[in-house]
Amino acid sequence: MSDSRAAAPAETRHSRIAALAKIGTCRTPSFSPDGAFAAFVSDLSGTPQVWQVSAVGGWPDQVTAFDDPVIAVRWSPKGDWLAVSVAPGGGLNQAIFVVRPDGSGLRRLTEEGPVTNELGPWSRDGRFLAITSNRRDPASLDCYTVEVGKWDWRPLTASPGDAAVYDFLPDAARAVVHRSPHRGDADLFLVERQTMRETLLTPHAGPANIRNARVSGQGDRVFFPSNLDREFCALCAIRLDPAGMPGPVEFVRDHPGADLDDLDVSRDGQRAALLWNAEGKSELEIVDLPSGDLVVRPELPAEIAMDPTFSPDGRSLALTCTGAAAPVDIWSLEIETAAWRSLTRSPHAGVALGDLVRPELVRFPAADNLPLSAWLYLPRDFERPGPTVLSFHGGPEGQERPYFSYLYQALVEAGIAVLAPNVRGSAGFGKTFVHLDDGPLRVGAVRDILSCVGYATGTSIADPRRIGIMGGSYGGYMTMAGLTEFPSDFAAGADYFGIVNFETFFAHCEPWMAAISKVEYGDPETQRDLLRGLSPIHKIDRVTAATLVLHGANDTNVPVVEAEQIVASLRARNVPVEYVLFPDEGHGFVKERNRIQAAQATVDWFSKYLNSKTPGALQ
């Protein structure tokens, strides 16, 4: 590491970190019915709100001004309402509102209180809005429809599991519902709106991942990504007869070795936009559905694309795009010419995007020779071996991909390398790989931490005396697992809202989340010994590394009791620990001032404890 960077005044370093953390995001486009405008969510004002912009680009207008962050927005097919979900205090108990496109007429549709609500789609005639909620049973997420004007709630489903409406049939008499009994398995159902009668669309044996489904323009086919009877998600379809009875699942299109992440189907049902995940990077295909032929495979503006959304006339496609050196922005593709237009331009004052570091995809074996991979971010004048931080993603069934990360860029600017791995249990590498950490197999994922250390030191990237570890949510669990299982390998750690005690996690998290997490982690009623053995809190006496703990007070995904346990235990043992609690955040830090504080605290922590060649030594 460059000594000049290591010794840079905190004030100078903090101003650079603030500039990186202030880089805005614009995401989740939703077109007006005439295609003239797009609504989207952006933190241009400091907290995510609803904005709208001309479909040809230009200066956006802010629509909402909530104190709390907006999660999603959907424009009604009639054009008269925007449906908006808001996270009070940043937590999971979202509130659903409707508001006029000009910002007037704000109306709350959900009740106050600790109820989980999620925004679903509009029916095609704009009469009904779908909402997922656990208002009936805290341990289950049910689907409801709300009729515009009456604003009354009508149940669509009332069964155990995590359910969500993916789409309505054209006449709004039936809806396609996704239901997951537990993580890693799901089904699609066709549900009659009036009677709640369900027809299973996807009978199968064994686990299957089913993602965002879309109904064809005529209502006779349902398209969706799935790994039913295969390793990777492909484009699947089910034909519906006039009575709604389904035919067998058909495989329409695949991409060997890649997962179909998301899709959209044009309003006339003629074309599909397919987003593939190929080794962590996105690839876009526009496909003619009647023939199955490829229309265009354009180069994307950045490494990652999300939220594919056709314009009402089907001539253009809006996407959220981002990359290691590209902020999160919305782009529009003119399909016939394959020309891209930027609809938004997230500000990046004080940051030259061309100076940001792009990662390299590296591969290495686990102890049992299972292939692992990671994204490696190296400072431009990095002196090997040097200070290195391992960063673990959340999930567990998440995936490290080359998204824009202000924290990674801040660390490499401070002269610290970042190795961000995908260990067993990560998504994007096939069905078998993602289930290799289920229940008692989790010990294998924890052992993979040591394989990551071995790669970093064996390639002379990391100084073995100056290695840190960090991660958020499940990545926070992996952080604390690394610090307890391999204490001599780490000089410092940063635990972002991570699980440290599976017993208290199950006791205090959202009941519906606890219900679907038993297969992934273990059943607290029948596998208590397993959960205790996997919980870092029961090995806390092994920790010697300086530990930074960051959490949101309103987190009901991983409740703050997890942070409180680890902080109290480390303080009692005189292990260096710092606790940063955000009173206005939930599971993740979205407000600008909090992003800045968290990033500054993290970079300061690793700069302090990894700059010395003696593990854990104070500067």
Spans of features found by a protein language model:
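Active-site-proximal cap/loop segments of hydrolase catalytic domains
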Residues: 423-619
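Short substrate-entry loop that stabilizes the transition state in hydrolases
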Residues: 382-386, 391-429
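N-terminal cap/lid segment of alpha/beta-hydrolase-fold proteins
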Residues: 342-382
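Conserved hydrophobic/aromatic pocket- or pore-lining residues that grip, position, or stack substrates
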Residues: 235, 330, 364, 374, ...
